[in-house]
A protein has these predicted regions:
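Metal-dependent phosphoester/phosphodiester hydrolase catalytic core
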Residues: 1-211
Length: 211
């Protein structure tokens, strides 16, 4: 995930900003672990999954069946590179107290604490913006009743505070010297020029609070 040149560059940047109140890291793919729950218990195998549209009903069923092993969902994210993730989080812990990681890619609104493997205190807070138009987690794993996949993932991953895998929108992050506040916002439709905006989950952290 990080070559030696990139890792050295990042450490130099972290050292140079040690006196800043907040440390924001913008990067592409999910850092927090995302282990699969046993989706056989919650997913509708006959649901209108976008996985079926891009692959096949048979492949979708195999993916659901494989979830019983509780493997990471995203092996092309940091979950596929656990040693690199540990190195990255060690850098953050070494140089900053107020670490906020901003992420996209998964098309799902997520808020999660980031831990080193043997630590009880989180190193950073990860904020993942929802999709603008692309399908999210619940669109891949439809349930009956709806939107139960996200809840199942939270139960399997206690470091995750929030998952919204259907609605489309954006994430706002406001920083002051005293606190950080993140607000997930959603639109009622992406198919029409007129829409309503609603507020979803929000989280506030104080500066120098264990995150």
């Amino acid at each position: 995930m990080l070559g030696s040149w990139q890792k050295n560059w990042l450490e130099q940047q972290l050292k140079a900003t040690q006196n800043q109140r907040w440390n924001l890291i913008g990067q592409q793919v999910m850092v927090a672990p995302l282990l699969q729950p046993d989706l056989r218990e919650v997913v509708d195998p006959n649901g209108n999954s976008v996985f079926v549209k891009s692959h096949s009903r048979e492949a979708y069923q195999k993916a659901i069946d494989a979830s019983k092993y509780n493997l990471p969902l995203l092996l092309d994210a940091w979950d596929g590179y656990p040693e690199a993730r540990e190195d990255f989080l060690q850098l953050l812990k070494r140089h900053h107290n107020n670490n906020i990681v901003l992420t996209g890619d998964i098309h799902t609104g997520i808020c999660a604490d980031l831990y080193l493997e043997d630590d009880e205190q989180p190193v950073a807070l990860e904020l993942i913006t929802p999709a603008v138009t692309s399908p999210g987690l619940d669109d891949y794993f439809p349930t009956n009743p709806q939107q139960q996949a996200g809840k199942a993932f939270i139960q399997q991953n206690p470091h995750i505070h929030y998952i919204e895998g259907t609605l489309k929108g954006w994430l706002e992050v406001n920083l002051t010297q005293q606190q950080m506040r993140a607000q997930w916002n959603y639109v009622s439709t992406v198919k029409q020029p007129n829409y309503q905006v609603s507020q979803g989950y929000s989280i506030t952290r104080q500066a120098n609070e264990a995150v």
